[in-house]
From Swiss-Prot:
Protein residues bound to 1-deoxy-D-xylulose 5-phosphate: G159, A185, G186, N207, T208
Keywords of this entry: Cytoplasm, Schiff base, Thiamine biosynthesis, Transferase
Originating organism: Anaeromyxobacter sp. (strain K)
Protein's cellular compartments: Cytoplasm
Keyword Disulfide bond: no
Name of the protein in its database record: Thiazole synthase
Cellular component annotations (GO), alphabetically ordered: cytoplasm
Annotated catalytic residues: K98 (schiff-base intermediate with dxp)
EC number annotated for this UniProt entry: 2.8.1.10
Amino acid sequence: MADTWSIGAHAFTSRLLVGTGKYPDFPTMQRALAASGAEVVTVAVRRLDLSKKGEESLLAWIPKGMKLLPNTAACFTAEEAIRTARLGRELEMGDLVKLEVIGDRRTLFPDVEGLIQAAKVLVKEGFTVLPYTNDDPVTAKKLEDAGCAAVMPLGAPIGSGLGLRNPYNLRIIMETVQVPVLVDAGVGTASDAALAMELGAVAVLMNTAIAEAKDPVLMAEAMRAGVEGGRKAFLAGRIPMKLHAAASSPMSGLIGS
């Protein structure tokens, strides 16, 4: 039986979501996206150059069959994010939107108040909202209450590659909300992706870790394996951590005893 997951009316098999920024060129991006096995690819609406057509357009290099997830990157107010989400829908990218309202240009941490404000408006307009948020369980719950279809807490600052800095809060978020939790931002390597899945994340979204790797295509394959391995480990159930050793074989009935 396939291990599927869903957001709103959309169902997926791959638990790795990928981005389109920072690649050295479009052909490399295309090969990496294909190697990742991802079904969802996020695109920054404000950074799309609509004047470019054919092979000059980023959209032309996205593998066929991938679901577009427009995002509101580079929006610093709720109003900007709302307008950008509407533009994405007008461009026929669908009702899914990765909602970003940035509060600080240096850290790219989210503006929580603006995020919740924008989420409420977009939910009322029929969008399936996936908000990029901090790792605060209280904020995650407020976003769920606002009608968001999922929450996407950061593992670390965007593009930092620091890995999951606060796995404890991520775990609390997963226990607090009923909607899917996707870890977004900060992943640096495959073990980070595996850890996110082992904690119980429904999926992981990343861009820089693949795009800026020395070999983006190989890293995409590694991230795919990391996500799949972490998911299997979560389903299998890890053994409890113990302070002292526990022998694998019985200590009684030993030869010579």
